[in-house]
Curated annotation (Swiss-Prot):
Keywords: Host cytoplasm, Host Golgi apparatus, Host nucleus, Phosphoprotein, Virion, Virion tegument. This is Tegument protein VP22. One of its GO terms (biological process) is symbiont-mediated perturbation of host chromatin organization. Residues 77-118 have a biased composition (Low complexity). One of its GO terms (cellular component) is viral tegument. Its main location: virion. Interacts with gE (via C-terminus); this interaction is necessary for the recruitment of VP22 to the Golgi and its packaging into virions. Interacts with gM (via C-terminus). Interacts with VP16; this interaction allows the formation of a tripartite complex composed of VP16, VP22 and UL41/VHS. Interacts with the capsid-binding protein UL16. Interacts with host CGAS. It comes from Bovine herpesvirus 1.1 (strain Cooper). A motif (Nuclear localization signal) lies at residues 131-134.
Length: 258
């Protein structure tokens, strides 16, 4: 309780008024028996307190209640006792839907395919098999049965060959020489046989040991013409092979039966 005074005409006479602060105030004032003005004012102001004052009193009371609880916790910590912590939250139950799912199967390894011409990355492709050997240039021209001819490139006589021209001309030259040499060897063998035809196995063995046929191909610039003539003659011969004038069939290395 706080006490205020106001001066009057007489310096020794004071009129006091009081204001209610809260219970257990720091101002401990005791009214005297001769202070009738103070008693009247106190009786007049003993009604209910305003709402704002009640809210402030409740707030102070709640703050005062929190402070002793905090002080008690500090005392327990200083004494070495532990304050019980709040109970931990219960463990989360696993979902039955997750446990019922089957395990995921492992992914299949990627299948490597051979790289094509249009693909840019062919380093990781697996080789399917060994590459097929290519036929030499000119082999198709010989197998076709058409007349043999050297390559027409280049146009000028002194220009160097480039690319597959060298391999093509080599194949044509070897085929032409083989055709001419085979025809000469056939004619020489027929001449040796007809000069002294063997009549027994003994004479045949003697002729085989003494026969020496040498073939010389020197056609020059007419090599391709001679080879093409041989090809034309072979096309006109009968298709029957191994037939003789006597009608007996003989295989290579096999002698005719008597």
């Amino acid at each position: 309780m706080a006490r205020f005074h106001r001066p009057s005409e007489d310096e020794d006479d004071y009129e006091y008024s009081d204001l209610w602060v809260r219970e257990n105030s720091l101002y401990d004032y005791e009214s005297g028996s001769d202070d009738h003005v103070y008693e009247e004012l106190r009786a007049a102001t003993s009604g209910p307190e305003p709402s704002g004052r009640r809210a402030s009193v409740r707030a102070c009371a709640s703050a005062a209640a929190v402070q002793p609880a905090a002080r008690g916790r500090d005392r327990a910590a200083a004494a070495g006792t532990t304050v019980a912590a709040p109970a931990a939250a219960p463990a989360r139950r696993s979902s039955s839907r997750a446990s019922s799912r089957p395990p995921r199967a492992a992914a299949d390894p990627p299948v490597l395919r051979p790289a094509t011409r249009g693909s840019s990355g062919g380093a990781g492709a697996v080789a399917v098999g060994p590459p097929r050997p290519r036929a030499p240039p000119g082999a198709n021209a010989v197998a076709s049965g058409r007349p043999l001819a050297f390559s027409a490139a280049p146009k000028t006589p002194k220009a160097p060959w480039c690319g597959p021209t060298h391999a093509y001309n080599r194949t044509i030259f070897c085929e032409a020489v083989a055709l001419v040499a085979a025809e000469y060897a056939r004619q020489a063998a027929a001449s040796v046989w007809d000069s002294d035809p063997p009549k027994s196995n003994e004479r045949l063995d003697r002729m085989l040991k003494s026969a020496a046929i040498r073939i010389l191909v020197c056609e020059g610039s007419g090599l391709l013409a001679a080879a093409n003539d041989i090809l034309a003659a072979r096309a006109q011969r009968p298709a029957a092979r191994g037939s003789t004038s006597g009608g007996e069939s003989r295989l290579r290395g096999e002698r005719a039966r008597p």
